[in-house]
């Protein structure tokens, strides 16, 4: 395994050389140089008179002396067979990763950096030594194929060097197996004496085999491995017996305490070089990395992962620290044990021991530690670890006193809490405190000896301990409890329903704590709800939210704070990614419980109900649009059938319990969906027309006029904001207006279309175009509506006693009322005064009603096109035509006889097509009003003289009037005049109405206008 690389390797390999080297390595792996299948411990010693010390043997960068001129064959062999091939393979993988990097500028920068440095330094020592490049190195090392190559190179290299430079191969002072002897205590203790080549004793090594109660460590992939046996070697710190150098290379053991085969052997090597006094000094330690320890005590054994297997090294944590201190002293460096400890212990992101590079000159120095992320730390859990993001680690990220939670828990829960509290007291970095709490939570949930009930009890105790710990800041308490909750969430062994109970208990602890502020309590509550909503099945989620809600209601919080907490629960449910149906259920349950417990204020109830209504509306909208799409994309359905079905859906929406605003949103989605469909524009316009008609004709009792207008505006907004082209939207806008008029919608409904356009998010030019389309549709519809006013009279005799509409009904009533009066006057018998007076008044009232109805009808038409409705063409037309209308009315007034007036109507209002329809119709409206007003005045005026009656009626003789009966005489005069004027003016009104029918039929209906007598 190689986390670091020698900066001074001086050979670059061609592809052919690499292939040749790889073949040699494969051959080395297949060789059997000794009869033993197991790997042996080895050592190499030299006397004090040796020309140079033997360098260490390791695949780790910096462990080879940085003297490029060295002629030591072992050094060269290590460089050429281990270090440089590993570096070449690593650079090759880094370049592949850079080619796939999204940030192309950074990728190109790093590629150039590598290429330029290779020209100056083929070993790329600067690149590998730059902390800024760790993320690229780490990412490359994550590649499984590369890792296999590096491990293969390392194993083959060790084997080659040990065999080539062994005593058995004839190398003077070379490596030779350690002969353990003096077995004591049933083979638990062994020893060997190490001598230099002069036969002088350098030291005695003691080895102790420890057969322990199995403990568990985790591999990088999260799987657990039990260690049942390991050994400890008492590596010497000071050597003062004899002169010379010594290199001890001890094979790493498998998890069961046995030695691996030679082709898989890896070693822990201690390098003792001759010091100034000739005595060996510990100058360097070489081992595969990252090195980890199975605990925090000095007796914790070291272990590594290599080739997917766990191996223990013959050194404890205490011995390793002692050796490291000696290495740094002998290198002339000060020792920072806290820093060394930081690097030794791997928790969270992996960290390794500092790399101590022995120098061959007096000016030697310690190379800066280099880090990598490769093998995860010890963990007592079988939970798969999530891969860490490649990044440049910080030297202070690791907690040197991180708890071995599994070991602590093996005693009792109180032991675990004691360890946790001790760590929290000692550690001031909140991030490390949280790591400690999370590690403890993991140990609790993965303790194989505990049942579910015990795990629940212990996890709750840990949460309570976190909340009440005085060494944690409020924010750290929040983060600590959240870490416990996150551990519960990620645990794969605890059933979700059991998790929901843990969540409820955690909420109860946090809310009832006197050591937290409301803000912190709410933050913990929200995290708990998040975890509850993340459970896998709906039953567990419902149980979690119900439990949390109950915990809030039963807590010792004030009623106001309880309401606030329930609102927080509801908000979390509301913004979750669950289905609307499940949201309805969960939020409805929270609301129901809150109302029943009387902890929600009216305002809070209203807010939660509004959120519930929105969820309901969203679900309704979703369901509705699905139905609409099914209808639109039905290939066997005609446009007429599509329209009918979508009208039915629209009607159901309008009849629903939602608010008008929500109904508007749904209708907007309907029209938007129709507009965005692939149907022909004319078909879409027909469907939209049906929607408009359905809204306009909907019952006023269930949907008020303002709400209809609001919904109609939404319908138009759905059209105008669709992605279809502008001409199609214009056509659909016209269709919507047509639907309004088909449904007899009033001016407010029509104006709402303009409001929908104004409130849309389209640009101004499109808004103007759509308003023009709406106004054009309104004008065309007005013509149709005006003609419909007389539709009931077409083809009918005015004298027939049949139902009439509006003005024509009243006109017929006048005729029916006046005829008996005329007939009575023409008979010789005297009329009854009271009856005549009554008829006069009724006639006057009817005529007034005619006038009012005419004015009202015309004003209604005008209101549809008024300036408030944004129908600007009406204003322009009024400005242009008002003068012409006045001229025509004035000219009509100059005609004294009925015949002249009828001729004027025909010539100027029917035949003269140079005048606009608008001008002619307005003239007729005004003349009708004048005629009705004139007759009303005639009926009510009692001072008209007999001769006026005779002149007007065409009589040539004056009849004497009895002075004895003045009342009758007066009645005769008034009624006589009234009779004449009404009869003639009714003829004029009939002519005006015929003219209007004719004008209206010019573009709408070519049938012959009805002639009125």
Curated annotation (Swiss-Prot):
Residues 62-73, 348-373, 380-396 have a biased composition (Polar residues). Keywords: Cytoplasm. GO terms for cellular component: cytoplasm. Residues 1-73, 348-396 are annotated as: Disordered. It comes from the Bacteria. Residues 47-61 have a biased composition (Low complexity). Coiled coil: none annotated. Signal peptide: none annotated. Residues 12-27 have a biased composition (Basic and acidic residues). Pfam families: 120_Rick_ant (PF12574). It is found in: Cytoplasm. The keyword NADP does not apply. This is Antigenic heat-stable 120 kDa protein. It comes from Rickettsia rhipicephali. The lineage of its organism: Bacteria, Pseudomonadati, Pseudomonadota, Alphaproteobacteria, Rickettsiales. The gene is sca4.
């Amino acid at each position: 395994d190689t986390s670091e690389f020698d900066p001074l390797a001086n050979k670059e390999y061609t592809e052919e050389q690499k292939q040749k080297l790889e073949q040699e390595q494969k051959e080395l792996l297949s060789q059997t140089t000794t009869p033993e299948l197991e790997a042996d411990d080895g050592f190499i010693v030299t006397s004090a008179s040796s020309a140079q010390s033997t360098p260490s043997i390791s695949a780790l960068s910096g462990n080879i002396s940085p003297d490029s001129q060295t002629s030591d064959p072992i050094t060269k062999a290590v460089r050429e067979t281990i270090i440089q091939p590993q570096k070449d393979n690593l650079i090759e993988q880094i370049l592949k990763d850079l080619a796939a990097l999204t940030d192309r500028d950074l990728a190109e920068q790093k590629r150039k950096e590598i290429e330029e440095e290779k020209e100056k330094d083929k070993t790329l020592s600067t690149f590998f030594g730059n902390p800024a490049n760790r993320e690229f190195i780490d990412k490359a090392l994550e590649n499984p194929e590369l890792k296999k190559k590096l491990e293969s190179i390392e194993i083959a290299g060790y084997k080659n060097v040990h065999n080539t430079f062994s005593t058995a191969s004839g190398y003077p002072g070379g490596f030779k197996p350690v002969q353990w002897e003096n077995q004591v205590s049933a083979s638990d203790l062994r020893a060997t004496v190490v001598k230099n080549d002069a036969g002088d004793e350098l030291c005695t090594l003691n080895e102790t085999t420890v057969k322990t109660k199995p403990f568990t460590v985790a591999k990088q992939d999260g799987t657990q491995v039990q260690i049942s046996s390991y050994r400890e070697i008492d590596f010497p710190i000071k050597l003062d017996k004899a002169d010379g150098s010594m290199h001890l290379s001890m094979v790493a053991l498998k998890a069961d305490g046995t030695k691996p085969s030679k082709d898989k052997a890896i070693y822990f090597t201690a390098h003792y070089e001759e010091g100034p006094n000739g005595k060996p000094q510990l100058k360097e330690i070489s081992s595969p990395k990252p090195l980890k320890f199975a605990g925090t005590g000095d007796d914790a054994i070291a272990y590594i992962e290599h080739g997917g297997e766990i191996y223990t090294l013959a050194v404890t944590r205490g011995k390793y620290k002692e050796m490291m201190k000696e290495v740094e002293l002998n290198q002339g460096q000060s020792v920072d044990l806290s820093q060394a400890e930081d690097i030794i212990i791997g928790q969270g992101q992996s960290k390794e021991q500092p790399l101590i590079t022995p120098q061959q000159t007096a000016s030697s120095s310690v190379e800066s530690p280099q880090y990598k992320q490769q093998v995860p730390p010890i963990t007592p859990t079988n939970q798969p670890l999530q891969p860490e993001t490649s990044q440049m680690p910080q030297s202070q990220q690791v907690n040197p006193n991180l708890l071995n939670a599994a070991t602590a828990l093996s005693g009792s829960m109180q032991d675990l809490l004691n360890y946790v509290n001790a760590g929290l007291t000692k550690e001031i970095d909140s991030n490390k405190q949280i790591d400690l709490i999370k590690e403890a939570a993991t140990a609790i949930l993965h303790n194989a000896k505990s049942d579910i009930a015990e795990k629940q009890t212990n996890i709750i105790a840990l949460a309570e301990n976190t909340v009440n710990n005085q060494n944690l800041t409020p924010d750290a308490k929040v983060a600590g409890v959240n870490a416990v909750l996150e551990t519960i969430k990620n645990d794969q062994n605890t059933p979700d329903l059991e998790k929901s109970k843990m969540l409820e208990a955690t909420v109860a602890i946090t809310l009832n704590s006197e050591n937290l502020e409301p803000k912190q309590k709410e933050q913990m509550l929200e995290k708990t709800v998040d975890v509850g909503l993340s459970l896998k099945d709906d039953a567990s989620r419902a149980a979690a939210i119900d439990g949390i809600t109950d915990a809030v209601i039963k807590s010792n919080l004030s009623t106001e704070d309880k309401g606030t907490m329930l609102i927080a629960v509801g908000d979390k449910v509301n913004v979750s990614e669950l289905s609307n149906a499940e949201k309805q259920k969960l939020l409805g349950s929270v609301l129901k419980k809150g109302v029943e417990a009387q902890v929600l204020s009216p305002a809070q109830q209203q807010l939660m109900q509004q959120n519930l209504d929105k969820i309901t509306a969203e679900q309704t909208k979703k369901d509705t649009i699905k139905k609409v799409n099914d209808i639109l994309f039905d290939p066997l359905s005609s446009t007429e059938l599509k329209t009918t079905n979508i009208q039915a859906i629209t009607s159901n929406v309008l009849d629903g319990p939602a608010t008008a605003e929500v109904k508007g949103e749904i209708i907007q989605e309907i029209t938007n969906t129709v507009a965005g469909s692939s149907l022909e524009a004319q078909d879409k316009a027909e469907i939209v027309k049906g929607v408009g008609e359905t809204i306009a004709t909907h019952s006023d009792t269930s949907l008020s006029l303002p709400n209809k207008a609001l919904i109609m505006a939404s319908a138009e907004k759905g059209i105008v904001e669709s992605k279809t082209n502008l001409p199609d939207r214009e056509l659909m806008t016209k269709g919507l207006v047509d639907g309004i008029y088909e449904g007899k919608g009033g001016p407010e409904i029509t104006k709402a279309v303009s409001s929908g356009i104004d409130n849309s998010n389209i640009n101004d030019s499109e808004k103007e175009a759509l308003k023009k389309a709406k106004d054009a549709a309104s004008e065309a519809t007005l013509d149709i509506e005006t003609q419909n006013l007389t539709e009931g009279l077409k083809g009918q005799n005015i004298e027939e006693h049949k139902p009439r509409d509006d003005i024509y009904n009243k006109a017929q009533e006048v005729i029916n009322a006046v005829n008996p009066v005329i007939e009575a006057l023409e008979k010789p018998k005297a009329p009854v005064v009271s009856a005549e007076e009554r008829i006069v008044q009724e006639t006057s009232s009817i005529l007034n009603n005619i006038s009012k109805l005419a004015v009202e009808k015309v004003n209604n038409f005008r209101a549809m096109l008024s300036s408030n409705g944004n129908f600007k063409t009406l204003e322009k037309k009024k400005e242009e035509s008002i003068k012409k209308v006045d001229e025509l009315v004035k000219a009509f007034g100059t005609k004294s006889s009925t015949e002249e007036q009828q001729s004027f109507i025909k010539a100027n209002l029917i035949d003269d097509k140079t005048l606009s329809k608008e001008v002619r119709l307005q003239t007729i409206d005004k003349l009708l009003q004048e005629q009705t007003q004139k007759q009303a005045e005639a009926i009510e005026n009692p001072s008209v003289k007999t001769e006026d009656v005779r002149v007007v009626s065409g009589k040539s003789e004056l009849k004497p009037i009895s002075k004895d009966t003045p009342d009758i005489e007066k009645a005769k005069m008034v009624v006589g005049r009234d009779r004449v004027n009404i009869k003639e003016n009714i003829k004029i009104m009939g002519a005006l109405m015929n003219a209007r029918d004719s004008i209206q039929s010019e573009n709408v209906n070519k049938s012959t206008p009805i002639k009125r007598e």
